[in-house]
């Protein structure tokens, strides 16, 4: 005697029946166990006398290669067909159960800071090192969010020389002329509205060993300066102009920051 267990899940409205086990004997008789209480209005799904359809052909190939194998002769009655309305009701109920939960709406990102740093101290710096000079200039730009912005500079130098840091329009020509470095053309005055807000310079002198000859003593001047400009919008763009003069070194440099990275409206240089 061999026993095989078959698990079939049948959805019959409104009760679910689980056919748990079928004990098969050599005589071909089957004993079926059902869980749940059957109703008189429902037909038995598995019977021995039904001749409608056999699935033994589908399962016989699995047991032919085994000794003392027994062909299975499981039969079932054709179930009662559902009406079209019943199918639509079943699909509607299953869809309602599988509907995903609505996603929570994300809150927009709100900027809480009043000030927006456009350029930090590390975004702009100029470092000059010579035998007689060690110069470092750093700057930053801060947008106040009220139509104005400030430009800050700090400068540290050890040695002798003159350093000038100023704001100029992009049309400023780079040249070795101290008299021309702070001149603003009349056509640029409307788009360039800046004034000095704060300025402080600290100087100290000392005698130290010379870099080029440690056996000698050199006179060194240490200078620390802080300056800030307050500018009003609208403006096109401002540039930073640095000029340095000493006995052995000259430098003139103009740097125009990239405002397209921070501005919603792109800047198109002209002139």
Curated annotation (Swiss-Prot):
Main location: secreted
Region (V (Cys-rich)): 186-271
Expression across tissues: Highest level in brain.
Modifications after synthesis and translation: May be proteolytically processed at the boundary between the N-terminal non-conserved and the central conserved domain in neuron-like cells.
Recorded superkingdom: Eukaryota
Listed GO biological process terms: modulation of chemical synaptic transmission
Any one of the GO CC terms: synaptic cleft
Region (II): 22-97
UniProt-annotated location(s): Secreted
Sites carrying sugar chains: 23, 68, 93, 146, 156, 162
UniProt-annotated stretches for the region III: 98-176
Alphabetized UniProt keyword annotations: Glycoprotein, Secreted, Signal
Molecular-function annotations in GO: signaling receptor binding
Span list, region IV (linker domain): 177-185
Signal peptide: 1-21
Its job: May be signaling molecules that resemble neuropeptides. Ligand for alpha-neurexins.
PANTHER family attached to this UniProt entry: NEUREXOPHILIN, NEUREXOPHILIN-1
Family: Belongs to the neurexophilin family.
UniProt name for this protein: Neurexophilin-1
Organism: Rattus norvegicus
């Amino acid at each position: 005697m061999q026993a095989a267990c078959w698990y079939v899940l049948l959805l019959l409205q409104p009760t679910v029946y689980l056919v748990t086990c079928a004990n098969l004997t050599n005589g071909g008789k089957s004993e079926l166990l059902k869980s749940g209480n059957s109703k008189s209005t429902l037909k038995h799904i598995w019977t021995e006398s039904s001749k409608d359809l056999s699935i033994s052909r589908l399962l016989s190939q699995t047991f032919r290669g085994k000794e003392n194998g027994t062909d299975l002769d499981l039969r079932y009655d054709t179930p009662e067909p559902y009406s079209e309305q019943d199918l639509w009701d079943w699909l509607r109920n299953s869809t309602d159960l599988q509907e995903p939960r609505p996603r929570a709406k994300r809150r927009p990102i709100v900027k809480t800071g009043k000030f927006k740093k456009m350029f930090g101290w590390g975004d702009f710096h100029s470092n000059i090192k010579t035998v007689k000079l060690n110069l470092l200039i750093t700057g930053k730009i801060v947008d106040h969010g009220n139509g104005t912005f400030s430009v800050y500079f700090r400068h540290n130098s050890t040695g002798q020389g003159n350093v000038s840091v100023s704001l100029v329009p992009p049309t400023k020509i780079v040249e070795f002329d101290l008299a021309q470095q702070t001149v603003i053309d009349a056509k640029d005055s409307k788009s360039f509205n800046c004034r000095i807000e704060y300025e402080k310079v600290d100087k100290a002198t000392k005698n130290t060993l010379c870099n080029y000859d440690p056996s000698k003593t050199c006179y060194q001047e240490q200078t620390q300066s802080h300056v800030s400009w307050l500018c009003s919008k609208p403006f096109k763009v401002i540039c930073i102009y640095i000029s340095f003069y000493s006995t052995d070194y000259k430098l003139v440099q103009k740097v125009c920051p990239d405002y397209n990275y921070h501005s919603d409206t792109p800047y198109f240089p002209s002139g």
